[in-house]
């Protein structure tokens, strides 16, 4: 049942999108490809950006344990599977030089792995940024110094950047909690952040990314659950980037 909820969200978003029929058909073929072959996606970012919450939202169930408070939950790369969709949840960077060095080596090792056919194991890397943070230096270093140099051929088409916690981008201000969406001031702020991230990544790597923003939703320390926002857009973003062949 959970598999259907993911695919239905993707298909509904494609069918309702204001895109040409040719492009719509291409996206539908990508969904079929996702169903037919195993797709490995690495999810990475700085500590506290919401990687585990994003995985839980995508799977529509609590498969990844979310850290509460100051301690990050993910300390090693963890694998989560839902049929042909395989997500690799990496430890967050930014918790100290020694830990970062260890995590970086593990990320590089995973990026270097190949499948039984000799192709790169990791098909896509999704870098998640914390929309509520002004300091994104750790994430930019991760992209420019770890992922780009170690991701092999076609990397310019296989790196996705998504800004999580859109609801907290202005410290919770200008978010309509009843309708679970940003008002126009926050939309403008988020759009400016998208352009800023795009510029920073291009300056550092020469690669053009097209960031999106969303909110995975999360459970706080008291078990209160907030609703996801723009999750279907995140799924659509991933489907759009699926390689045409392994």
Model-found features: residue ranges?
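Conserved GTPase G-domain signal focused on the G5
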Residues: 50-51, 217-246
């Amino acid at each position: 049942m959970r598999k259907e909820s993911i695919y239905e969200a993707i298909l509904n978003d494609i069918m309702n999108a204001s895109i040409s029929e040719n492009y719509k058909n291409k996206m539908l073929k990508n969904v079929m490809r996702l169903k037919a072959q195993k797709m490995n996606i690495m999810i990475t970012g700085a500590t506290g950006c919401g990687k585990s919450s994003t995985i839980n939202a995508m799977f529509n169930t609590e498969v990844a344990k979310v850290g509460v408070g100051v301690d990050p939950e993910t300390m090693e790369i963890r694998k989560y599977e839902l049929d042909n969709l395989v997500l690799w949840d990496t430890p967050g960077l930014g918790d100290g030089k020694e830990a970062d060095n260890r995590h970086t080596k593990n990320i590089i090792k995973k990026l270097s792995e190949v499948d039984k056919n000799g192709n790169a194991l990791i098909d896509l890397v999704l870098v998640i940024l914390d929309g509520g943070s002004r300091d994104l230096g750790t994430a930019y270093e991760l992209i420019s110094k770890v992922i780009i140099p170690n991701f092999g051929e076609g990397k310019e088409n296989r790196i996705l950047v998504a800004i999580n916690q859109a609801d907290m981008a202005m410290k919770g201000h200008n978010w309509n909690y009843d309708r679970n969406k940003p008002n126009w001031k926050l939309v403008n702020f988020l759009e400016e952040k998208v352009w800023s991230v795009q510029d920073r990544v291009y300056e550092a790597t020469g690669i053009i990314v097209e960031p999106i923003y969303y909110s995975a939703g999360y459970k706080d320390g008291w078990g209160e659950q907030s609703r996801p926002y723009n999750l279907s857009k995140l799924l659509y973003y991933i489907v759009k980037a699926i390689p045409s062949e392994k």
